[in-house]
Swiss-Prot record:
Recorded GO MF terms: hormone activity
Modified residues (Phenylalanine amide): F36
GO CC terms: extracellular region
Xref: CDD domains: PAH (cd00126)
Name of this chain's protein: Pancreatic polypeptide
Keyword Glycosyltransferase: no
Protein role: Hormone secreted by pancreatic cells that acts as a regulator of pancreatic and gastrointestinal functions.
Domain of life: Eukaryota
Amino acid sequence: APSEPHHPGDQATQDQLAQYYSDLYQYITFVTRPRF
């Protein structure tokens, strides 16, 4: 399972934030999807 991404912090660049939110979205999708 993917690990929860860490927020890059207040000094993060837009690219770092975009990558973080992309990773976070994938993480949440993985964690919350039903297990059949």
